[in-house]
Amino acid sequence: MSTKNPSVFKPSRGVAYQLAKFFTRKGEERSAFYLVWHVVLRDRKLKLKLYPQLAYSGVMLCVFFFTSLKKDKPFQENLDELVLEGGGNFYLFFAYFANLSLSTAISLMPYCDDFKAAWVYYALPVNKPGEVIVGGLKALIFKIYTPFFLIISSIILSVWGLKALDDLILVYINSIIISMLTAKWDKNHLPFSEEHTVQQGGGNFGMVMLMMVIVFFIGGSHYILATYTPWLVPITIPLIATALFFLVKDYKDMSWQNFETIDV
């Protein structure tokens, strides 16, 4: 992946092009964004692993929603009770549930059918491998997580109203932080640098469990904040966004010493 010619993975002027233009820097980061965006679309084994799990997440969310309804009450009365449940902030559970889609995508990002092409990371002048990871994560966030989150957010806003908007913004920023912390604490793997068949289910399960623990901690803190001091939520948003900025910067500054050797 050459820094001198980042247009290698440059698509036509569609959605990916516009997102990369506004949210990535030229060079390794933007090239990785294009690469991950297109491999997610084209890699057959990756899609067979990713999309069924995304569908499962959606089904489980529907199951949780409908099992919370009482059969002996009208649907509208059930909705009214649901709005009041958990101090009126029960929607945070559904909002943070969308993290399952992101955790699944991140756990699969290192694997690809053409993993032997990973030697290019070392052969070409990739000076900041951390930017490759950041570009890949941004592609997954916009390609996988954001559409799922927008669907859930539209449902939440239709039921709970605009009072949930500040919380949803905070959930989105927190979710990006959660994904970056999980990827950083897990072993660093460059995008599509390993074979599908050597993927260890236990390692992926551990990564998903780690993300769930972080989600529980951050989501629980958010719930307490929204329940007892809701006026602090809009104040917290710029503070958390600033923390995300420095986290991304720290990730981009990672050197090759932070990465495992690619065995090709």
Residue ranges and their predicted role:
Residues 1-121, 128-264:
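Hydrophobic alpha-helical transmembrane segments of membrane proteins
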